[in-house]
UniProtKB/Swiss-Prot annotation:
GO terms for biological process: regulation of translational fidelity; tRNA threonylcarbamoyladenosine modification. Belongs to the SUA5 family. TsaC subfamily. Keywords: ATP-binding, Cytoplasm, Nucleotide-binding, Nucleotidyltransferase, Transferase, tRNA processing. Its EC number is 2.7.7.87. It catalyses: L-threonine + hydrogencarbonate + ATP = L-threonylcarbamoyladenylate + diphosphate + H2O. It comes from Hahella chejuensis (strain KCTC 2396). This is Threonylcarbamoyl-AMP synthase. The keyword Nucleotidyltransferase applies. Pfam families: Sua5_yciO_yrdC.
Amino acid sequence: MSAWFIQKAVSVLSRGGVLAYPTEAVWGLGCDPSCEDAVNRILQLKRRPWRKGLILVSGQIEHFSQLLDRLPQQQKDQILATWPGPVTWVVPDPGVYAPLVRGAHDAIAIRVTAHPLVVELTKAFGGPIVSTSANPATREPARTLFDCRRYFKSGVDHYLPGKLSGLSKPSQIRDAATGAILRQ
C-alpha cells in the first residue's frame, strides 16, 4: 500500500472524518473513536441504533493496553491467545472513548487484526479506529469497494483502496469476563 494512501486516511481520521476500508471479511466504516461527531456520523450513515455500540480495531496490542491492564491475568491471557485475529473481545469500559462507541453498554468491544492494511493504518494513526461493517441497517455488508460506494456515495470522506483478507464472515465476539461467545 502506498504511503500516500495511508497518510490521506490518517489525515481524514485526524480531522474527524469517516473512512471506508477493507477488513478480514467485509468492508468497514471507521473513524477516530474519541471524536463523538464522527462516531455519530457513522451511526447515521448506517441508520444503526446508538444503543448497540461499535467495535474498535487496531493492528497493535499496545493500543489497548489501558483496557487490558485492568483485567485479571487469566482474562488477558485468553484474549492475547486469539490476537492478532478475527476475534473481538468485550471488556469493561473505563470511559476512554466517545460514549457512543460503547452504546448502552458498560463495556467496549475491541479487536487486534492481522489485516495488513489496517495494521499499517492504525500504526500511522497512533491508535485504534472504529470498525463497523459498511452497510445500512438491514442491508448486506459491502464486500467490494463498488458496493461500499453504492451504499454511501459522498457520505464517506475517503475510501481506502485494498482487498479483503478472504474470511467468509465477520469476527467472532466474546465476553472477556465469561468467555461466552456473543456472535459466532
